């Protein structure tokens, strides 16, 4: 069976805000299966935002696990991310899950992978998925050359990615939090 694939998730932190946005397209092979999936959501009583790229069912499993880690560690994003990454890498069932997560709270932004990596991005910017590099390049240019808000940068960069990446569409879900940095 062919794998569900492709998406674009982008996070920007600027001027007291952190924003994560993603498109809504779910593709299987060359077929668009759904155009309005919600790949970005709030967790931990709205204090954390998270986005995923990869298998949808896998991502929901990981969101549930991550939220339970947040509960266990009193909302400590980094500790919860490290604990999820450890489980993801060592648990035989979780190891088969194919997804990447971006997570952010008021203090930190992280990418969590199934290889056990927890990556803190440079320059307050992170992107994952098939259109991630396009969105990241666009957002980097906008961060360096404009005074646009974090939300506007995410909107514009996702639009550029959707113009280039066939696995990314214009049905965006965008979540925003106040940020300390």
Curated annotation (Swiss-Prot):
According to its UniProt record, which reaction does this protein catalyse?
A: ATP-dependent cleavage of peptide bonds with broad specificity
Catalytic residues per the record?
7
UniProt cross-references to Gene3D superfamilies, sorted A to Z = Glutamine Phosphoribosylpyrophosphate, subunit 1, domain 1
Q: Which residues bind Na(+)?
A: 162, 165, 168
- BP terms from Gene Ontology: proteolysis involved in protein catabolic process
Q: What class of enzyme is it?
A: hydrolase
- Which E.C. number(s) belong to this protein? 3.4.25.2
Write one Pfam family the protein is assigned to.
Answer: Proteasome
Q: Entry's CDD domains?
A: protease_HslV
State any single GO MF term. metal ion binding
Q: How is its activity regulated?
A: Allosterically activated by HslU binding.
Q: Does the keyword Cytoplasm apply?
A: yes
- Keywords from the named record: Allosteric enzyme, Cytoplasm, Hydrolase, Metal-binding, Protease, Sodium, Threonine protease
User: Where does the UniProt annotation locate this protein?
Assistant: Cytoplasm
List the GO cellular component terms: cytoplasm; HslUV protease complex; proteasome core complex
Q: Which PROSITE patterns match?
A: PROTEASOME_BETA_2
Q: What does this protein do?
A: Protease subunit of a proteasome-like degradation complex believed to be a general protein degrading machinery.
Query: What does the sequence similarity comment in the record state about its family?
Result: Belongs to the peptidase T1B family. HslV subfamily.
How does the record describe its quaternary structure? A double ring-shaped homohexamer of HslV is capped on each side by a ring-shaped HslU homohexamer. The assembly of the HslU/HslV complex is dependent on binding of ATP.
Q: What PANTHER family does the database record attribute to this sequence? A: ATP-DEPENDENT PROTEASE SUBUNIT HSLV, METALLOPROTEASE TLDD
Q: Which NCBIfam families match?
A: ATP_dep_HslV, PRK05456.1
This protein is called ATP-dependent protease subunit HslV
**Species:** Coxiella burnetii (strain RSA 493 / Nine Mile phase I)
The gene coding this protein: hslV
């Amino acid at each position: 069976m062919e794998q569900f694939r492709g998406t674009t998730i982008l996070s920007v932190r600027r001027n007291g805000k952190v924003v994560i946005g993603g498109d809504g397209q779910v593709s299987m092979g060359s077929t668009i299966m759904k155009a309005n999936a919600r790949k970005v959501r709030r967790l931990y009583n709205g204090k954390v935002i998270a986005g995923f790229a990869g298998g949808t069912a896998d991502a929901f499993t990981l969101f549930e696990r991550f939220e339970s880690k947040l509960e266990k560690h009193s909302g400590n994003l980094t500790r919860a991310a490290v604990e999820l990454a450890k489980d993801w890498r060592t648990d035989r069932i979780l190891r088969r899950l194919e997804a990447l997560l971006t997570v952010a709270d008021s203090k930190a932004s992280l990418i969590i992978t199934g290889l056990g990596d927890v990556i803190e991005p440079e320059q307050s910017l992170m992107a994952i998925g098939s259109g991630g590099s396009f969105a990241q390049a666009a957002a980097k240019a906008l961060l360096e050359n404009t005074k646009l808000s974090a939300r506007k940068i995410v909107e514009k960069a996702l639009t550029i990615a959707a113009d280039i990446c066939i696995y990314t569409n214009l049905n965006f879900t965008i979540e925003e939090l106040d940020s300390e940095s």
